[in-house]
């Protein structure tokens, strides 16, 4: 389970890496369950999507070859502040939300569409991208846990697949929250070394940069195709110096 990750810094990286404005308020360097972090989603709008009309073909132009339809406009992304640890929409109270969200910082891609905690959020296509510089795992090969930082080899920010939710209580309280989607890493050349032996190895579903918009807009059945283990040779592991 990924319960600790490092936020993007400096904040000037947000526009180039994710095509969103930098956060208005500082984000903690290290994120843990129930701490406020940020995520990126498709901009929410109550307006109907514009209908793109096909380009007319003049009578003088040859009509032997069909013209390609105009490309659909890319979704506008927005950066949102939320709690790390998802609060399901059916939670009854703030106190219950606090208890449950601590355990809901990760969602397994294999069961996300059937889990009582995440099913509604997944089917509503409330997908997001969680920006980070690195995530942390324990190296237990020596017999004691050694916190280890996992980052991209090139040092650039990572965009991890996630889900977001906005819970509203009976008294009007609201909590915006998010969770990280994870995939199996038993056979992963790097991540297979870490975490507890004899248990299933997991890792966050790091997205390819070119698939961000497609991930945010895909149909739920199609969205599963984006949830894959990130190549080991694109990642770098370093023990955390105390």
Residue ranges and their predicted role:
Residues 1-242:
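Short linear sequence motif anchored by a di-proline
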């Amino acid at each position: 389970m990924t319960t600790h990750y490092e936020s993007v810094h400096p904040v000037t990286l947000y526009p180039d890496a994710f095509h969103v404005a930098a956060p208005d308020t500082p984000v903690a360097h290290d994120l843990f369950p129930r701490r406020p972090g940020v995520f990126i989603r498709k901009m929410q709008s109550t307006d109907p999507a514009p209908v793109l009309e096909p380009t007319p073909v003049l009578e003088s132009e040859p009509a032997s070859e069909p013209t390609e339809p105009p490309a659909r406009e890319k979704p506008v992304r927005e950066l949102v502040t939320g709690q790390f640890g998802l609060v399901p929409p059916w939670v009854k109270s703030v106190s219950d939300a606090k208890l449950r969200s601590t355990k809901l910082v990760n969602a397994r891609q294999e069961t996300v569409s059937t889990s009582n905690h995440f099913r509604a959020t997944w089917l509503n296509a409330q997908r997001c991208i969680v920006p980070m510089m690195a995530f942390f795992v324990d190296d237990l090969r020596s017999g004691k846990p050694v916190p280890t930082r996992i980052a991209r080899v090139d040092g650039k920010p990572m965009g991890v697949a996630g889900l977001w939710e906005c819970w509203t209580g009976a008294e009007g309280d609201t909590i915006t929250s998010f969770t990280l989607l994870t995939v199996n890493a038993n056979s992963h050349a790097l991540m297979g070394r870490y975490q507890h032996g004899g248990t299933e190895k997991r890792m966050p579903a790091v997205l390819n940069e070119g698939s961000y918009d497609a991930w945010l807009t895909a149909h739920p059945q199609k969205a599963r195709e984006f949830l894959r283990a990130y190549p080991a040779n694109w990642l770098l592991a370093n023990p955390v110096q105390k």
